[in-house]
Swiss-Prot record:
It is found in: Cell membrane. Keywords: Antiport, Cell membrane, Glycoprotein, Membrane, Transmembrane, Transmembrane helix, Transport. It comes from the Eukaryota. Belongs to the CTL (choline transporter-like) family. Residues 1-38, 264-265, 347-351, 396-460, 537-610, 671-717 are cytoplasmic. It comes from Macaca fascicularis (Crab-eating macaque). InterPro entries: Choline_transptr-like. Signal peptide: none annotated. One of its GO terms (molecular function) is antiporter activity. The keyword Cell membrane applies. Its main location: membrane. This is Choline transporter-like protein 5. GO terms for cellular component: plasma membrane. It holds the Pfam family Choline_transpo.
Length: 717
């Protein structure tokens, strides 16, 4: 049976999915006679962009990024702001950190204790009563202690009066600044968590408290700081290593270029280089984790868990735990096994992958400008991300300071009500709830704009998702048009028009903005549902309802499958749009029917190639990552002058690895779109033509031959 003959069951399936393409002597690839498609969706998309710009301008007028950059004390004043009394007081200090374990921390998004700005954190244990005893002998002790008190504090007040006025903390303990806040200076001694070599301390109220309680309190505060930066040390590391990071990223770009060039000539050999390289890099990671795990067995303190040490100002402490390296080793072992199993089960399709890689290399060789297109995508995505972040920051910092009643003891019927700190002590609330505080809570307001800020946040996120998916869709459609032009050129490169990528990009923008917006809107809606689902999961993660957890897991799985299926269909729809210029729904239907009419050939499609390209990305990122690890940890004696001593070597290391992967993804995504476009055009070619002299195939003979062999084997089975 030759390739043009079809069994009866296949013919009936094709009737269900439309008629095959017929021969058209005038068809020479992407049509030039087009009209605008999905105009209504285009208009809605443009209106949303205009609204997005207006929202950004309004947020810029009302917002104040200083509220995100500086910590705010209980009076709503910024710590460290220039031109204010707190200019030299850059750190936020909590009077009673132990109160941050209260459930009201999550309810009010604020720790129920007085907070002031200080210039430095305490360096020793000292209670207020002990300070008073020392003050009678040496007045300088008050000068040290008053740094952590209000300006109205006096050293002669009794402890009872001090608690009533809330002028000073009852006790201080060794702390270090982290995220511009004073956190306990934790350390380990003989496997035990300590602060200043102590495991217990006096709280200033006559009680003895453990270090574990302080750790829990610090963790409670940390839940409120998840949107803050990692601190000054991270920026110091970036300032020291930025040029080395750029060098690493340039090496990744050159390496990606080299791989793409080599794929055209030695695709088979390079395939096995990918396989062996990825397995080797993961194997090295397993060996390194095992070595670190073995070495740490000699240190008693390494038996602590991440939960035991809690939040740390020195993140390197986590890498001093056996648990960290053991977990990383297990993860890498699982990845290694998955890669090896996939190679075993996909071994029969390696030939298809190699041929498709060669065909993709030829196409890119004839249209080299496609390798530059990822730079445009990167620029557009960067603009979208920056605008979204800036708008979100200005929205989050819009409004005026809002103060709320906080009862440290938790026994006040007026708790969580708004208040005015200027007159709070004279109000009925202060009389009804002795010890209650009127502390800064957040920035808000009662105007119409402030009431709709949560809605604006949702709109900001949704349009952001729509825009980034549109940018990706635009790139896929433009690349598909360029590669389709290559495929349908009978004599290459003579029949390939000049500037195919520029022409395809212009067609996509001029005629098909609405169709691309339609497809990206569907993906954005699915992603919004996923985000809402994750939000609900976060709110309900402490529930013990097994049914609820099961339903959440099922919904996650369903949305993940739906998103990937829609993305696959959208890519093929964009290819059809690039070739025929029809609207999104018609193009998606045509692409789906084409794939279903050729379901046997789809069984040997380019999915294996995607896997190979993914391994190529891992190989590039892993190779640069290993080199960066050896360099930033000063284990490369070949380079005499490396980076200076770093606070956290993993900061530039992770940046280089992530950046290298994104660069490799940008280059290899062009390859992936090329392969998918060639495959769709190949299916159309088989339906339009029969290989005769009058109707010759446009596909190359090696690719045609291997697909005919695969189809024959499938039919025989």
């Amino acid at each position: 049976m030759n390739d043009t003959e079809k069994p009866a069951d296949t013919a009936s399936e094709e009737e269900d999915f439309g008629d095959p393409r017929t021969y058209d002597p005038d068809f020479k690839g992407p049509v030039s006679n087009r009209s605008c498609t999905d105009v209504l969706c285009c208009m809605i998309f443009l209106l949303c962009i205009v609204g997005y710009i207006v929202l950004g301008l309004v947020a810029w007028v009302h917002g104040d990024p200083r509220r995100a950059a500086y910590p705010t004390d209980s009076q709503g004043h910024f710590c460290g702001q220039k031109g204010t009394p707190n200019e030299n007081k850059t750190i936020l200090f909590y009077f009673n950190l132990l109160r941050c374990t209260s459930p009201s921390v999550l309810l009010n998004l604020q720790c129920p204790t007085t907070q002031i700005c200080v210039s430095k954190c305490p360096e020793k244990f000292l209670t207020y009563v002990e300070m008073q005893l020392l003050y009678t002998k040496d007045k300088s002790h008050w000068e040290d202690y008053r740094q952590f008190c209000k300006t109205t504090a006096k050293p002669v007040k009794s402890l009872t009066q001090l608690l009533l006025d809330d002028d000073c903390p009852t006790a201080i303990f060794p702390s270090k600044p982290f995220l511009q806040r004073c956190f306990p200076d934790f350390s380990t001694k003989n496997g035990t968590l300590t602060i200043g070599s102590q495991i217990v301390f006096q709280d200033g109220n006559g009680g003895t408290r453990s270090v574990i309680e302080l750790r829990d309190a610090a963790n409670g505060i940390n839940k409120l700081l998840d949107a803050k930066s990692l601190g000054l040390k991270v920026f110091e590391d970036y300032a020291t290593t930025w040029y080395w990071i750029l060098i690493g990223l340039m090496i990744a770009m050159v390496l990606s270029w080299i791989f793409l060039i080599l794929l055209r000539f030695i695709a088979g050999c390079l395939f096995w280089v990918f396989m062996i390289g990825v397995i080797g890099i993961i194997g090295y990671g397993i060996w390194h984790c095992y070595q670190q795990y073995t070495n740490l067995q000699e240190h008693p303190r390494s038996v602590l868990t991440v939960y035991d040490i809690g939040i740390q100002t020195n993140i390197s402490m986590y890498f001093e735990l056996q648990q960290t390296w053991f977990t990383l080793m297990i993860i890498l072992c699982i990845i290694e096994v998955i890669v090896i199993l996939m190679l075993i089960f996909l071994r029969n399709r390696i030939r298809v992958a190699i041929i498709l890689l060669k065909e993709g290399s030829k196409a890119i060789g004839y249209v080299p400008s496609t390798l530059v297109y990822p730079a445009l995508t990167f620029i557009l995505l960067s603009i979208c991300i920056c605008y979204w972040v800036v708008t979100a920051v200005f929205l989050a910092t819009s409004g005026v300071p809002v103060y709320k009643v906080i009862a440290p003891e938790g026994h006040c019927i007026h708790e969580n009500q708004t208040c005015d700190p200027e007159i709070f002590n004279t109000t009925e609330i202060a009389k009804a709830c002795p010890g209650a505080l009127c502390n800064f809570a957040f920035y808000g307001g009662k105007s119409l704009y402030h009431q709709y800020i949560p809605t604006f946040h949702v709109y900001n996120l949704f349009v952001f998702l729509w825009l980034i998916n549109f940018v990706i869709a635009l790139g896929q459609c433009a690349l598909a048009g360029a590669f389709a032009t290559y495929y349908w050129a009978m004599k290459k490169p003579d029949d390939i028009p000049r500037y195919p990528l520029f022409t395809a990009f212009g067609r996509a923008i001029r005629y098909h903005t609405g169709s691309l917006a339609f497809g990206s809107l569907i993906i954005a809606l699915i992603q919004m549902f996923k985000i809402v689902l994750e939000y609900l999961n976060h709110r309900l993660k402490r529930t013990e309802n097994t049914l609820s957890k099961f339903l959440q897991c099922c919904l996650r799985c369903c949305f993940w499958c739906l998103e990937n299926a829609i993305k696959f269909l959208n890519r093929n729809a964009y290819i059809m749009i690039a070739i025929y210029g029809r609207n999104f729904c018609r193009s998606a239907k045509d692409a789906f029917n084409l794939l279903m009419r050729n379901v046997l050939k789809v069984a040997v499609t380019d999915e294996v190639t995607y896997f190979v390209l993914f391994l190529g990305k891992i190989l590039v990122a892993g190779s640069i990552g290993v080199l960066a690890f050896l360099f930033f940890t000063q284990r490369l004696p070949v380079i005499a002058q490396g980076p200076a001593s770093l606070n956290y070597y993993w900061v530039p290391l992770l940046t280089v690895i992530l950046g290298s992967y994104l660069i490799a993804h940008g280059f290899f995504s062009v390859y992936a779109m090329c392969v998918e476009t060639i495959f769709i055009c190949f299916l159309e070619d088989l339906e339009r033509n029969d290989g005769s002299t009058a109707r010759p195939y446009y596909v190359s003979q090696p690719l045609l031959k291997i697909f005919q062999e695969e189809n024959l084997q499938t039919k025989q089975q």
